[in-house]
Amino acid sequence: MSARVSLFVNCFERDYRRVLAPGFMKAKAGQFQFPFERVVVTLNNIADSTAAVALAQEARRRGELDEFIEVAAALPAALEKCGLSLRDLGLVRHYMDFALVAVAAAAPHFLLYCCAEVDLLTPFDWITDAVAKLGADPRLLVANPSWASDPGGAQRESIARNGDHWVGMGFSDQCFLADAGRLAAPIYHHKHAAGERYPMSDLGDTFEKRLDAYMLHHGLLRLSDARVFYNHAGIEGANYPKLPLFRRILRKGKKVLGFQKASPKTSETLSGGAHLADNHSMKGST
C-alpha cells in the first residue's frame, strides 16, 4: 500500500494563470510517477482572488487538482499550529506563509512540496524509497531530488551514503518531501548563522532558513536522491525589493567572515555504519 502523500504547489500573482491553465498540474503531478492522495494548489498574494478561485475551480472540475487553498484564509490556523504570529513573518511573509499552510494542511501525512518553477529532468518515482527511509530513521527529516544547477553538489555536500541517497545537512523549499506531522509544530524559532547563505536572509527569516536552523540545532539530516535531478527555472526573490547598498555590503561581509557554521550535533552514526562528520561545510547548499 502506498504512503499517503499529498502534492502541494504554490502560486503567486505572477504565475497563477499558468499554474491553473489546462494541463499544467496534470503534467506537474505526472512527472513524479506516484499515486498522490491529493493534489493541492495554494493561492498566495494574488491581487484578484476571485479570478484565481474561478480558475482553480475549473482546474478541479477538469480533475487536475483535488483541492485549492487560499493562503490568507488558512494562515491563522497554520500559525497557531506552528507556534508563530503574523508579526513573526515580517517582510518575508510570502516566503513563509504558503509553506506553513501546506504543512498544516498535509499533516499528519506526508507532504511533497514542489515550486511551480521546478521540474524533474526525467520523470521518476523517487518518493517511494524516500518515504520508507524517512519513516525508518527519525534523524532524517526531509528528502529531495538532487539539483541540476550543480550536479555534483549533493555528493560534495554529503556526509554519508545511504543506498541511492546522499545524506547531508541543509534544506531547500524548492522541492522537498517530509512527514508533515513533524513540520506542523512549533519548531520555527531557531536561529543559526548558516542561514546567512539563503536568499532573502537580510530581509527576514524565510521558511527554508527557519527549518534549516531547526535541523542544525537538532542534528537532523536530509536525503538527496542520486538518481534524479530537478531544475528550478525561476528567479529567487523576484517579487521582493533589492536590499539597500549598505545592507548588501554588510551581507557580503558576513559571508567573507565565514558565518556559515555547521552544527556540532551531527556527529552520529547512521544505521548503515557511515560516520557523520561534525564539521561539514554548509556552503552552496541548494
What does each model-found stretch correspond to?
Residues P22-E37, E58-R61:
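Short, acidic, metal-binding catalytic loop of nucleotide-sugar glycosyltransferases
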Residues V39-N44, A72-A73, P145-A148, L221-A233:
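Acidic carboxylate-rich catalytic motifs and surrounding loops in phosphoryl-/glycosyl-chemistry enzymes
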Residues V103, L121-M200, A213:
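Conserved catalytic core of nucleotide-sugar-dependent glycosyltransferases
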Residues M1-A29, V41:
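N-proximal low-complexity "stem/linker" segments adjacent to membrane-targeting elements
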Residues D15-R18, I46-L55, P151-A154:
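Short, charged/polar "capping" segments at the starts of alpha-helices
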Residues C175, A180-G181, I187-T286:
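C-terminal catalytic/acceptor-binding lobe
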Residues N44-A107:
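Active-site-proximal specificity loops/subdomain of glycosyltransferases
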Residues P108-D119:
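Short beta-strand-to-loop acidic/aromatic patch adjacent to the donor-nucleotide binding site
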